[in-house]
Amino acid sequence: MARLPKRKNRRNEKKKNANASRVQNVPRTFGLWKSTERIKYTTELKYLNSKCRAIRLHPDLVANNSFPTYCSAWKIDQVEFEFVSYMSPLAGHVGCVFFVVIPAKGLNSRISADEAESLQSAILWDEKGRLKITPISGPISRHPWTNLSQVVTPPQIPKGSTDGERQDLQSGYYLIFDSRKLFGKDLVDKQSVLGELSLTITATYWTSLS
C-alpha cells in the first residue's frame, strides 16, 4: 500500500514567513540615535601638471571634527562648495576648471589620481547618453579672483549596488578636481596654486545609545 504524503503544517509556515518579512523590514538604523552635523574642510588646489585629483567626502575628512569614530552608520546629505581663485588676471588663462561629485563604490573604496583621470571620461555618460555624475562648476578662467560657490545634493547610490551597500549609508562620495584643460602663464610650475577650496558637509549619523 502506497504511503500517503505528509500534510504540510500551514500554520507553522505562515509563522515562519511572517517572522522573515518582519526581520527584512527592520531598518539597519533601528534603535540608534540620529543626529545631524556640519563639518568644514579647506585645502589649496595645485595645478599638478594636468592631473586630476580625487578628494573623498566622508565624516572623517577633517581630523578634529565632531563626528564620533564609533558611529554605526552615516550618510552625506549636502555639500556646500566654495572655490576662491588665486590665478592672476594678467596671466591670460584659457580653459576651464571642473569639479564633479561621484558616488563611492563602498565604505573602503579608494581612488588614485590616475583612476580619477580615467573616471572623467569613463563615468561621465551612461549607455543611453545621460549624465551619471553631478558637475559642480564650469569655466572660471574669465572671472579670476572671484568666488565660485554652489550647494550640491550628492546623487543617490542605487539600491543593490556594488559591495552590497544598502541605500547610500557609509558609501561616501568623491570630489574630482580637473584642471587639465586650463592653461596660463603662471601655470608653468606644476605646483602652482590655483586657489582655495572650502567644503561644508552636512551629514547625518547614527550612534548607539549605550
Curated annotation (Swiss-Prot):
Query: Where, per UniProt, does this protein localize?
Result: Virion
Q: Membrane among the record's keywords? A: no
Give the principal location in a single coarse category. virion
Keywords annotated in UniProt: Capsid protein, T=1 icosahedral capsid protein, Virion
Q: Where is the composition biased (Basic residues)?
A: 1-14
Annotated region Disordered: the residues are 1-21
Q: Which GO terms describe its cellular component?
A: T=1 icosahedral viral capsid
Keyword Transport included in the entry's annotation: no
Superkingdom of the source species = Viruses
Per the UniProt entry, the signal peptide is none
- Please explain the role this protein plays, according to its UniProt record: Capsid protein self-assembles to form a baciliform capsid with a T=1 symmetry, about 18 nm in diameter. The capsid encapsulates three genomic RNAs (Potential).
Q: What is this protein called?
A: Capsid protein
Recorded source organism is Ourmia melon virus (isolate Melon/Iran/VE9)
What broad taxonomic lineage does this protein's source fall under?
A: Viruses, Riboviria, Orthornavirae, Lenarviricota, Miaviricetes
